[in-house]
């Protein structure tokens, strides 16, 4: 049962709160997007502990780390269980909800067509923006600019020695791709291209001209931001 503290230390049930203040009722009346992160988490928790109601407990969990709601993804079930009021049942519900959201975000529709740099960043943003290591990816396109496949070329600190043209073009040749968009993430969140980023791009473009498979863009993904070499007329 969820409780809300009164100023004189007695408690009232959340069901006795004004309807517009209750997370479930608020969601039904105004839509799920009207809820704060704490209210969404409170719906999963359902109850609080002896000192906090569900919303207060949700706020406490979110504010335990500077990353806010995002740090829940890195927490284990055991770590969640160590929080007062969070047992095995609530911990598994939280982790299941996070995984479901992650799978929805990473779902890739078949034959997704790329019309501009915004399309490609939208397609890959959620799967790359939170990674703690740099991942260099080659996205393979057909003649209609539809995604055929993608391949992780390297994982780790980006350098021309790790991003070898052979690995970029090998799968493209096998899949009969006509174009390639290369992309990688910056774990720092910044999307400013480094000198190494530019050198790698130039090298791949030259190789593509020889092979006959065009590198049409290089996208850098940051924390909700992106940088397109094509949009910025670097290529």
Curated annotation (Swiss-Prot):
Sequence ranges assigned to domain MPN in this UniProt record: 113-235
List of residues binding Zn(2+): 184, 186, 197
Presence of the UniProt keyword Chloroplast in the record: no
Motif (JAMM motif): 184-197
GO biological process, one term: proteolysis
GO molecular function: metal ion binding; metallopeptidase activity
Domain of life where this protein originates: Bacteria
The UniProt record lists the keyword Hydrolase: yes
Alphabetic keyword roster: Hydrolase, Metal-binding, Metalloprotease, Protease, Zinc
Signal peptide positions on this chain: none
Homology family: Belongs to the UPF0758 family.
Protein name: UPF0758 protein CD630_11440
């Amino acid at each position: 049962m969820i409780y809300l503290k009164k100023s004189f230390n007695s408690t009232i049930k959340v069901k006795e709160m004004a309807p517009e203040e209750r997370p479930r009722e608020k969601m039904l009346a105004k839509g799920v997007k009207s809820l704060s992160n704490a209210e969404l988490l409170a719906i999963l928790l359902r109850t609080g502990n002896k000192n906090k109601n569900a919303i207060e407990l949700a706020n406490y969990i979110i504010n335990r780390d500077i990353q806010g709601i995002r740090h829940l993804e890195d927490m284990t079930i055991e770590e969640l269980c160590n929080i007062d009021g969070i047992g095995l049942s609530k911990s598994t519900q939280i982790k299941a909800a996070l995984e479901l959201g992650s799978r929805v975000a990473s779902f890739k529709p078949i034959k997704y067509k790329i019309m501009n740099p915004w399309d490609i960043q939208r397609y890959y943003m959620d799967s790359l923006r939170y990674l703690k290591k740099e991942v260099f990816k080659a996205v393979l396109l057909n003649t209609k600019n539809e995604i055929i496949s993608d391949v992780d070329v390297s994982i780790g600190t980006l350098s021309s020695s790790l991003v070898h043209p052979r690995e970029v073009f090998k799968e493209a040749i096998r899949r009969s791709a006509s174009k390639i968009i290369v992309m990688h993430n910056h774990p720092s969140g910044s999307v400013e291209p480094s000198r190494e980023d530019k050198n790698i791009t130039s090298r791949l473009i030259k190789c593509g001209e020889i092979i006959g498979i065009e590198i049409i863009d290089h996208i850098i993904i940051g924390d909700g931001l992106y940088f397109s070499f094509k949009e910025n007329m670097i290529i």
